[in-house]
C-alpha cells in the first residue's frame, strides 16, 4: 500500500478554489488520508440530524465536512492569495515548503 503525500498539513492556512466556499480561507483542522480529504475550520458547513444519546441532546448540529485535497490550495500571507508550494533546503539542512511566487517559508 502506498503512502499518500499531501501538500497540506494540519494547522496550515488554506484557500478553497472550487465549490460553495470558493475563495474563502481557513485553518486545516484534520487530514483524512483514506478519503483524500481535509477538514477546514468554518468551511463546508453541513447540518447533521443527531439522535439523543445519554447526556447528549438530539437535534440539528452544524459541523465541518471534508473537502477534497485537490479543492484547496495553501494561502500565502505575504502574497495574500492561494499559491503553490515547493520544497527547499535551508542552510541548516532542514527541508521546508516555500511559496513559489515570493519564497516565504510555510514551515517554521
Curated annotation (Swiss-Prot):
One of two assembly initiator proteins, it binds directly to the 5'-end of the 23S rRNA, where it nucleates assembly of the 50S subunit. InterPro entries: KOW (IPR005824), Rib_uL2_dom2 (IPR014722), Ribosomal_uL24 (IPR003256), Ribosomal_uL24_KOW (IPR041988), Translation_prot_SH3-like_sf (IPR008991). Pfam families: KOW, ribosomal_L24. Belongs to the universal ribosomal protein uL24 family. One of its GO terms (molecular function) is rRNA binding. The keyword Methyltransferase does not apply. GO terms for biological process: translation. This is Large ribosomal subunit protein uL24. Keywords: Ribonucleoprotein, Ribosomal protein, RNA-binding, rRNA-binding. CDD domains: KOW_RPL26. It comes from the Bacteria. Part of the 50S ribosomal subunit. One of its GO terms (cellular component) is cytosolic large ribosomal subunit. The keyword Repeat does not apply.
Amino acid at each position: 500500500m502506498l503512502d499518500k503525500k499531501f501538500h497540506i498539513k494540519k494547522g496550515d492556512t488554506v484557500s478553497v478554489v472550487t465549490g460553495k466556499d470558493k475563495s474563502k480561507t481557513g485553518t486545516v483542522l484534520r487530514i483524512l488520508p483514506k478519503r483524500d480529504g481535509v477538514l477546514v475550520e468554518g468551511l463546508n458547513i453541513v447540518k447533521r440530524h443527531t439522535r439523543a444519546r445519554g447526556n447528549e441532546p438530539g437535534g440539528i448540529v452544524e459541523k465541518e465536512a471534508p473537502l477534497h485535497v485537490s479543492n484547496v490550495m495553501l494561502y500565502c500571507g505575504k502574497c495574500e492569495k492561494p499559491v503553490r508550494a515547493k520544497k527547499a533546503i535551508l542552510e541548516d539542512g532542514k527541508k521546508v515548503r516555500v511559496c513559489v511566487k515570493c519564497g516565504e517559508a510555510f514551515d517554521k
